[in-house]
């Protein structure tokens, strides 16, 4: 993990600006940059037929930070990828419980969905705010990206499902259920998706048509979770009736029912790497891992003191499973390491038993605990696609990021997330006043990030300020003002009728003779206005009155004559390039700019002018 410098290096709280004003200096923000570790691994690794990694091995010293490797470089060492270090806590200015957290497919941003129906986008490297938008009218309960990374679907408490493009352009909305939707999942081909609702049913929809194809009925109570196997035509669902069911999506038939829990099922999830296991969690303080080949549970995950609310598999290590509890605790399990506490004996795994069909499931305790990860229930967990950062969303309205500790970082086990605020304050690893000050600084940073947020290029541009209300013309979008009153009709003039006769003849009009040329005025070389006024005085031509109307000509009825010295308003001076850029960087609660508009903007600046 690197650090982004924000301000000077002296540790002061501020300094003098160029104009002598006091300038507040922000502290450094933690930034995770995985580019260096990926490059280091790609540079030093050897081909498969010549052996493995040839670089320096990591050791518990800060000097070995440069030798850190990504999880893909150590697939068989899941213990090195356990996220024990707290990186950052992100929170909105207007706080709501976080129901779902999802990394974007490329891993550059984290998308969170709250009970207010809003999408919030956080930067995946610096964890700062990027944009926010109102996506649903009610609480968002589920999010899922397609396997092709081209689509995002979301479901809310009203039973609606919405289609989104990667730039968060809402394409379609369908009313899938009349009750809240608790979970949804894409099929391996992305041609269909399935929803689980409180009406106790599962529904399979055709993604392209947005129409329901089949309804899966069999649960006796609310369906709380559903998942589609990553490579096979197999569905799994968990319900409030304590049952886990496996379904055939082609025939809508229930294949089998797994009886392993004694309370409401909170999460069911297939393992994505090998696809041979299924993890389930429930409100009975346990989680279970089922082997689909044996159709039985092989691991019983213990250790939680409260109910388990969610779980997630690691994207690289198939034996690393993380769970979140109703009390805000975050536990990490290695399925091949039972890790029993003192006083508990080892149990035999079904794989090692002579009769694997009758032996009970092996009890597994957490390899690492973060008891105080959140203050309230953890509703969602999601791993970065590379597997080096875990994001958690909680009922305490905070989104937190977790990662592995750097070599030599031993104080991570003594922070307030591991031992609590009181114990950490007693040991001097956390200050209550400093914690409040840090929270205020984080909120201030998020407010400043909102000011620098992404811009919606499709938003209407504001009118030119400074123009008064001209009759018959709009006011250019001035705040708080409407359009001007249209001018009254002129008596005797109808739509399409002839213009009224003038009360006096004007030279050159109505067949009259043109005005005589002014003496000393060359028609081929017009003079400047000052010279023209001087010639008009010498020729005896009367100057126009201050009202800018010829003598005898009255203004139209209903419009007062302009006062003396009246002139058109001076247009505002053109904005500089810097001011125009600042005016454009105004936060709008709207979708992200489209890629096409962004490309045009870059091309106008002289970038990306040629195809690559």
Curated annotation (Swiss-Prot):
Start-end of Pro residues biased regions: 486-506, 544-575
Nucleotide-binding found in the keyword field: no
Keywords, sorted A to Z: Chromosome partition, mRNA processing, Nucleus, Repeat, WD repeat
GO terms (BP aspect): chromosome segregation; mRNA 3'-end processing
Main location per the UniProt record: nucleus
Subcellular location: Nucleus
GO CC terms: mRNA cleavage and polyadenylation specificity factor complex
Region feature (Disordered): 1-21, 424-450, 486-514, 544-612
WD repeats (start-end): 93-132, 135-175, 177-215, 218-257, 260-300, 303-345, 373-412
PROSITE patterns in UniProt: WD_REPEATS_2 (PS50082), WD_REPEATS_REGION (PS50294)
Biased composition (Basic and acidic residues): 430-442
Pfam families: WD40 (PF00400)
Function of the molecule: Required for 3'-end cleavage and polyadenylation of pre-mRNAs. Also involved in chromosome segregation where it has a role in chromosome attachment to the mitotic spindle.
Name the record gives this protein: Polyadenylation factor subunit 2
Organism of provenance: Gibberella zeae (strain ATCC MYA-4620 / CBS 123657 / FGSC 9075 / NRRL 31084 / PH-1)
């Amino acid at each position: 993990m690197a650090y982004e410098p924000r301000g000077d290096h002296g540790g002061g709280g501020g300094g003098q600006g160029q104009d002598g004003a006091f300038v507040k200096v922000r502290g450094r923000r933690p930034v995770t940059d995985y580019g260096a570790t990926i490059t280091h691994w790609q540079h030093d690794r050897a081909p498969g037929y010549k052996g493995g990694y040839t670089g320096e091995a990591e050791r518990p010293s800060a000097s070995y930070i440069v030798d850190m490797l990504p999880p893909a470089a150590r697939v068989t060492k899941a213990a090195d990828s356990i996220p024990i270090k707290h990186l950052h806590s992100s929170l909105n200015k207007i706080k709501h419980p976080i129901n779902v957290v999802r990394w974007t497919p490329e891993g550059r941003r984290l998308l969170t969905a709250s009970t207010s129906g809003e999408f919030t986008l956080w930067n995946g490297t610096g964890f700062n705010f990027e944009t926010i938008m109102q996506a649903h009218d009610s609480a968002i309960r589920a999010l899922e990206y397609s396997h092709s990374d081209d689509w995002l679907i979301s479901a809310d408490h009203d039973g609606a499902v919405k289609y989104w493009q990667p730039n968060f352009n809402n394409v379609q909305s369908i009313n899938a259920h009349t009750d809240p939707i608790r979970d949804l999942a894409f099929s391996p081909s992305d041609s269909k998706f399935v929803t689980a609702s409180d009406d106790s049913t599962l529904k399979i929809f055709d993604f392209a048509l947005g129409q329901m194809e089949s309804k899966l009925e069999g649960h006796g109570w609310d369906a709380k979770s559903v998942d589609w196997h990553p490579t096979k035509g197999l569905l799994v669902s968990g319900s409030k009736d304590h049952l886990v069911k496996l379904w055939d999506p082609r025939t809508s038939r229930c294949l089998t029912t797994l009886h392993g829990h004694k309370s409401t099922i909170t999460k069911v999830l297939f393992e994505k790497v090998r696809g041979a296991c299924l993890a389930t969690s429930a409100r009975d303080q346990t989680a279970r891992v089922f082997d689909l080949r044996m159709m039985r549970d092989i691991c019983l995950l213990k250790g939680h003191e409260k109910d388990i609310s969610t779980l997630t598999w690691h994207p690289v290590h198939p034996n690393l499973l993380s769970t979140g509890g109703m009390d805000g605790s975050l536990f990490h399990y290695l399925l091949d390491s039972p890790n029993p506490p003192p006083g508990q004996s080892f149990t035999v795994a079904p794989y090692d038993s002579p009769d694997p069909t009758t032996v009970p499931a092996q009890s597994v305790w957490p390899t690492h605990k973060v008891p105080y990860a959140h203050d309230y229930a953890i509703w969602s967990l999601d791993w970065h696609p590379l597997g080096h950062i875990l994001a958690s969303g909680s009922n305490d309205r905070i989104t937190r990021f977790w990662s592995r500790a750097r070599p030599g970082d031993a104080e991570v086990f003594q922070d307030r997330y591991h031992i609590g605020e009181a114990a950490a304050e007693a040991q001097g690893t956390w200050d209550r006043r400093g914690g409040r000050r840090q929270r205020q600084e984080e909120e201030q940073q998020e407010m400043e990030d909102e000011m620098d947020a992404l811009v919606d290029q499709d938003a209407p541009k504001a009118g030119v300020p400074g123009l008064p209300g001209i009759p018959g013309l709009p006011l250019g979008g001035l705040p708080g003002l409407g359009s001007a009153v249209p001018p009254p009709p002129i008596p005797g003039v109808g739509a399409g009728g002839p213009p009224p006769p003038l009360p006096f003849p004007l030279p050159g009009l109505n067949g009259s003779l043109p005005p005589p040329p002014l003496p000393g005025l060359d028609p081929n070389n017009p003079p400047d206005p000052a010279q023209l006024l001087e010639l008009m005085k010498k020729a005896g031509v009367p100057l126009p009155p201050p009202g800018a109307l010829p003598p005898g000509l009255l203004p139209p009825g209903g419009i007062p004559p302009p006062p003396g010295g009246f002139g058109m308003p001076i247009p505002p001076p053109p904005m500089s390039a810097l001011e125009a850029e600042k005016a454009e960087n105004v936060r709008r609660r709207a979708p992200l700019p489209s890629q096409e508009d962004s490309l045009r903007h870059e091309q106008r600046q002289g970038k990306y002018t040629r195809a690559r």
